[in-house]
Structures are given as structure tokens and as C-alpha cells.
Amino acid sequence: MGGNVGLSKAYNKAVESIDGRDGYICFFDDDTAVPENYFALMEKEIEKTGADILLPCVFDRNGYMSPCKISGVSVSAISSLEELNEDNISGINSGMAVKAEVFKAYRYDENYFLDFIDHKFLSDMKKQKRKIAAAKSVELKQSFSANDFSDIKAARRRFAVFKKDYSLFCRQAGGLKNKLIGALVIAKRFININFIGRLRSK
């Protein structure tokens, strides 16, 4: 594709290269540990739920990373799958299984480079009345670098990408409340990197 053009463009290129629109397409990050029985378990979850989109249970060192809850532009972790419903469910792309037919008339928003591509996608799918479900029996482990501030310079570069993508997500969501929440989230992450992260590294 010629250099790092962004994850959304890479996803679209991959989707376009797949022949046919039967079955499901599964997405994985390179920092996600995938168990050998992933596909067998996911197939059972598809049969059980009949969902268009299935989100496995992805864990990082703090607990559930995905699925998660979303309210407007505010994303928060869950402690139990019982907290989820069809309105507030969201999650990350890694491990996600999507019915191939979904992409007959959908492409990822290429204005996003790396962050919030998944939340934007799931928001769009809710508008299309697609069924989204948690694949309760499928568990993955994730090493997520966005919250690692041990390398301040790398964290600042990562923050610049996050800020651009999340600001776009907030603008597209619209409304003063969402813009204010977005500004607070960005400010909090900036402080964590430039002040708290620096103190921890000393």
C-alpha cells in the first residue's frame, strides 16, 4: 500500500480483496494473543447468537478491555458483561467477527488513522440496526500500548494520533456536551503523559 497509510485504509483494502460475501471476517491486532480454539468457539457463538457482529472478551492487565460501554463519546470499561445492552455496547476491532455481507455497502471512515475506528464502526452499525453481541466464551489477551507512558517521547507521538482521531469522533457525534467531554478526555491524557508519566519515569 506504500507506507503507513493508516488502519482504516488497511481495513478497507483487506475487505475489498476478499472474494464473496459469505461467512464472517475476523480482525486481529498484532499485540493480541489468539487461542487455538478461537475459530471453533466463535463459530458456536455465531450459531447461538445469530449476531452480525461478535465481540470476544479481550482482557488487558486491568481487566475487561472489550467489550466496553459507550455513552455519547465517553468510553468506559466494564466489570461484568451484564452491564452491556444493545445501546451501550462497543469494543475494539481485535478479535471482532463481522458478517461479510455488512461490507457490501460499508467502508471504514478513512479520515481516522488509528484510534476510534472501531467505535465509529460500531456506532454506524447500530444506526443500521445490526445485531452486536458479546462472544462470551471467547477470551483473548491484549497488550495495549496507548496507556503505557514509560517512554515519554513515544507516548507523546501516540497521543498526537489519539487526539486527532478522538477529536474527529467527537465532532462527528455533534453537540456541545460531546465536545466538552472530548476536551476533558484529551486534557486528562495530556496531563497523564506530560506530568504524571514523567514523574513515574524518574
What are these regions (language model features)?
Residues 22-33:
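Short beta-strand-to-loop acidic/aromatic patch adjacent to the donor-nucleotide binding site
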Residues 134-153, 165:
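Active-site donor/metal-binding and catalytic loop motifs
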Residues 153-202:
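Non-catalytic, C-terminal membrane-associated alpha-helical segments of glycosyltransferases
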Residues 79-98:
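A recurrent flexible, glycine/aromatic-enriched loop bordering the glycosyltransferase active site
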Residues 2-19:
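Glycine-rich, basic loop-to-helix element that forms the pyrophosphate-binding segment
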